[in-house]
Amino acid sequence: MAGFLDNFRWPECECIDWSERRNTVASVVAGILFFTGWWIMIDAAVVYPKPEQLNHAFHTCGVFSTLAFFMINAVSNAQVRGDSYESGCLGRTGARVWLFIGFMLMFGSLIASMWILFGAYVTQNIDVYPGLAVFFQNALIFFSTLIYKFGRTEELWA
């Protein structure tokens, strides 16, 4: 079941060579998702300025997601595999630990945003939009991180 799409071929457009534009497309899509996540949260903060409506402590999920975005994308895949020419101060093990901590921060922020959504808004029978804004901010930053990390190639002349 895991490889049921291995032989599937998407229809190809002959006018555009996407392999040359892979890094550009992945970077633009990741940037749009990242921007949209923060835009939604800023909109919620403007619409609901009182702490009773949107607690200002709920912004920390987005801050930690953003920190995790930079942590995850600061480590190249070659450093994780051990293929890079420079080993750095901690080498391959340090890169893997750094990447693991980044993913733990990212998943922790996403889970905390779901907790905020359901614990502070859905069960309290108040307006749910601030909770949805916190959740979608973290979800969009999460998907932005995955696209920016794994959607690009690291080969300079691919």
From Swiss-Prot:
It comes from the Eukaryota. It is found in: Endoplasmic reticulum membrane; Golgi apparatus membrane. Expressed in brain, heart and testis (at protein level). In the cerebellum, has particularly strong expression in Bergmann astroglial cells (at protein level). It is a multi-pass membrane protein. The modification N-acetylalanine is found at A2. Keywords: Acetylation, Endoplasmic reticulum, Golgi apparatus, Membrane, Transmembrane, Transmembrane helix. The keyword Acetylation applies. InterPro entries: UPF0220. It holds the Pfam family UPF0220. The keyword Transmembrane applies. One of its GO terms (cellular component) is Golgi membrane. Belongs to the UPF0220 family. May form homotrimers or homodimers. This is Transmembrane protein 50B. It comes from Mus musculus. The gene is Tmem50b.
